[in-house]
Amino acid sequence: IIKIKADTNQGINCDLRLLEDLLAAIGDNEILHACITYGTKPLPIIIFMALNYVYKVRNNTNIETIIYGTMYSGKKNEPTIYDETALFYTNEMFMQLADAGVSDPVKKVKAMRGMLEE
């Protein structure tokens, strides 16, 4: 487990420093698990940016899990953990559709939903 300290100050310099630290910590042949529960509002976006980059550029680096946890959901002592990994891969799929110049992504999404509902 590698812990990277995120500055609570917000601004482009702090965001870029965190992105730099994340990218420096992730090499080739990695299996990554990320938690986006704690931190400032930009933190999950920065983590997703770093994960997107290393997924595309590093050799044999996989995003295994991205989780978000809630400590309080209106009921005492019922924390919930959400697996956001599918959201990461859905974003990757949309980036590939955009790169391919797909003009009707809604049609593709409907087709994928149909496959999942079968």
Regions found by a protein language model. Give the residues of each.
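Long, low-complexity, Lys/Arg-enriched
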Residues: 1-31, 46, 52-118
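Gly/Ser/Thr-rich loops at beta-strand to alpha-helix junctions
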Residues: 36-49
